[in-house]
């Protein structure tokens, strides 16, 4: 995908955003810093939605956007949409399915689902023509075995008719005919090879990146429908795709903190054989990604310290640095500073 296009979609005309953070958020690079900026930018639900899909050319992408006057950029590659950039963003949004679907592609491996489904469609299509001599699409071994098992279990039960009916019903419900065309042009079957994003883009008069995003969002929409139908014959294709909201290690640290109130964070770190700084990072991760009602802020954040920080906090929390805050509050540590910011952002969310 073209990173410059992606940056336009997830930038703002009212908030300077770190271009590197936007990219790291979308590919799901799980650090407390990236999670915090996702919360700050309102992109937490999109975290990891484009995992493995973006190139590593931030400098070139920002330069391109700046030269075309779509963004303003500073020396740290923070970007702000110009009026021209906002207009272009609006046009991009109008050309795509609903972007709220990204929240689902963040929670599930939609790219993996699309590969499974494409192989399943190819196999069933060839089966319907009694053709055993073809080259199946290459996907991961475990996924290939899953599809093979699924096909063997269901092929005798009018599978071609069922699959055709399901896909036809899905395509008929799409808001635009062009979305249905993009989806089907990507599929392979009997005497039919799926087109590349570039080929589909030429036919549709759209960029390959817009085609890629459209496909991702359409596969996401289909996946959400299948997840709501546990009795569907295609339900096995959705297995093992869910992504955890919180990392396993952070969840373990947070669980110990909640279940054993007598243990200090230092003691928890000792029992878990991790560094104290790592334990703090785990608790910050939990505070960011879990619902506010699940976080015992009253135990984590000293009330008197919270009052001091509340008295001096600026209107824009994103522009408030630890260095500035620590000059105003004696013995302030970064953990409490960041925790305070997280709580404030969640309260105003």
Where would I find each of the regions flagged by the language model?
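Accessory beta->alpha helical hairpin/"wing" motif in late/C-terminal subdomains of nucleic-acid enzymes
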Residues: 72-112
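Short, amphipathic alpha-helical interface elements at domain boundaries
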Residues: 1-54, 142-158
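Short Lys/Arg-enriched helix C-cap and helix-to-coil transition segments
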Residues: 222-239, 290-306, 349
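Short, amphipathic alpha-helical "recognition" segments used to contact nucleic acids or chromatin
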Residues: 3-14, 180-194, 247-262, 305-316
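Short amphipathic alpha-helical interaction segments
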Residues: 51-67, 207-216, 277-282, 332-335
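A short, conserved structural fragment
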Residues: 63-76, 224-225, 288, 292-293, ...
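Short alpha-helical "recognition helix" segments of helix-turn-helix
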Residues: 22, 199-202, 268-270, 321-327
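Exposed, interaction-prone assembly regions rather than primary DNA-binding/catalytic cores
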Residues: 97-173
